Amino acid sequence: MGPKRRQLTFREKSRIIQEVEENPDLRKGEIARRFNIPPSTLSTILKNKRAILASERKYGVASTCRKTNKLSPYDKLEGLLIAWFQQIRAAGLPVKGIILKEKALRIAEELGMDDFTASNGWLDRFRRRHGVVACSGVTRSRARSSAPRAPAAPAGPATVPSEGSGGSTPGWHTREEQPPSVAEGYASQDVFSATETSLWYDFLSDQASGLWGGDGPARQATQRLSVLLCANADGSEKLPPLVAGKSAKPRAGQGGLPCDYTANSKGGVTTQALAKYLKALDTRMAAESRRVLLLAGRLAAQSLDTSGLRHVQLAFFPPGTVHPLERGVVQQVKGHYRQAMLLKAMAALEGQDPSGLQLGLVEALHFVAAAWQAVEPSDIATCFREAGFGGGLNATITTSFKSEGEEEEEEEEEEEEEEEEEGEGEEEEEEEEEGEEEGGEGEEEGEEEVEEEGEVDDSDEEEEESSSEGLEAEDWAQGVVEASGGFGGYSVQEEAQFPTLHFLEGGEDSDSDSDEEEDDEEEDEEDEDEEDDEDGDEVPVPSFGEAMAYFAMVKRYLTSFPIDDRVQSHILHLEHDLVHVTRKNHARQAGVRGLGHQS
């Protein structure tokens, strides 16, 4: 079995050519075995000797990696980037992979290359094409990001002890499937949420983390900052960040520190620091005569004492819940912070100023404050809406909240009511069936009376049919509202197939009873006018399928809002009753029309 085929670099091919020229008396087969290549490959290399040597001179150091003359689709961009890279390295300054990517994006913008993204895969291929050696701690591999990664986030957020468990916080009960329920009755500007994240700094000055000739092993960046971010649901208030680190609190300059800073041995937000933060927030809310709800997650608050808080109610997300600010806000803050560091590094490299690569704690705090300020309020409100908290200015959270005991009692009551309703429904059905049988026997006897009284009774039948069989939208909407205890004042206009739906507050009159009486009088007048026509037009009766399709549309609209299980149960009961009534009325009306044709 011959040697395994592999593609040689230009440097390896040049070395083979040199070996052949230095040993003219050596057989070609012996040289092929020495380099573990087939004789045919050796013949091809010698045939293309001039082109191979030219390519080696062209690519220089990169010839140790390049195997073909195939150009990159971004060849012009990479030419400018490698020239800039060589200039910076000649000055003895380190260049990290993230800085290479940022510089490449700038060059692409100048060249108008909108499709260029500077991905990790491109960076890996760029290094291979141009012989850029990745030292430890810089561009690690194709599958890993070049930026340093913070440690894994701590375990799930703390849960609040129930009332009587010894905790100082009142007995909030939060359920994983309905985390916004605790915010019922609060305006969106009074619902705050806080989360903790990590940022890194002081890794730009690591001289050993350079590319292409780094002097020794790289030192991992160990300077980590824990940042507590807090904002309200409509994004109108972003509280100053609380930053914690291991370094001692720096001296404030003339303008002071841009955000609060606390130091401890672990570099995280401690219970004491959080208590002080909440106390300051409570004092501020007292001065503004406001009572707010603060939803927290991933905080060191298991043993937090909140007995002194009068204007701030604290609650926690259950484990496994995605925090509102973690739906995009935290990522934005990290992106703005990283961008600020890269811009600083780029300016230092292009100005060949090694001292510019030093990032101190005070400057890092300014970067944190600027990154938090750059987040748009609309983005914060969007993340809260995605988490189920509504959003928008002056909006009110209307989701329901009940304790476990209340929910169990309501479930038991609902089960008892359902059993009673089922029993009553069966009795009513039996009575109605008996009445229908008696009515069917008496219809033939009273047929002559119907003919004598005639058209007035027919108009009454048609009026009853239109009100019960037609299933008007206002009656359906009002019935659903009464069953659910009242929705908000929603009004939806359907332009095409369906009539206008007005969902009013439970117990509210639509336009007063006088309007309904006027409508009834107008219908009576129209029926009397139709009596003069011997071939009077019959009121069209919707089919059972049409009626149920209409109800399905209304049901979809109702269930698109956040409703509790009790309202859902009422909707199901209403659907059952409507099916029963519609079938009965449809059968009765068909029987009346059949008797009319026979007479």
Swiss-Prot record:
Q: Where is this region: Disordered?
A: 143-183, 394-476, 498-543
Bias (Low complexity) ranges = 144-158
- Chain intervals with Acidic residues compositional bias: 405-475, 506-538
Per its record, what are the GO molecular function terms? Answer: chromatin binding; DNA binding
Q: Name one GO cellular component term.
A: chromosome, centromeric region
Q: Which residues carry this modification: Phosphothreonine?
A: T396, T398
Q: Give residue numbers for the modification (N,N,N-trimethylglycine).
A: G2
Post-translational modification, as annotated:
Poly-ADP-ribosylated by PARP1.
UniProt subcellular location: Nucleus; Chromosome, Centromere
Give the top-rank taxon of the lineage listed in the UniProt record for this protein.
Eukaryota
Region Homodimerization, annotated ranges: 536-599
Q: What does this protein do?
A: Interacts with centromeric heterochromatin in chromosomes and binds to a specific 17 bp subset of alphoid satellite DNA, called the CENP-B box. May organize arrays of centromere satellite DNA into a higher-order structure which then directs centromere formation and kinetochore assembly in mammalian chromosomes.
Please give the name of this protein. Major centromere autoantigen B
| Taxonomic source organism | Mus musculus
Q: What is the lineage of its organism?
A: Eukaryota, Metazoa, Chordata, Craniata, Vertebrata
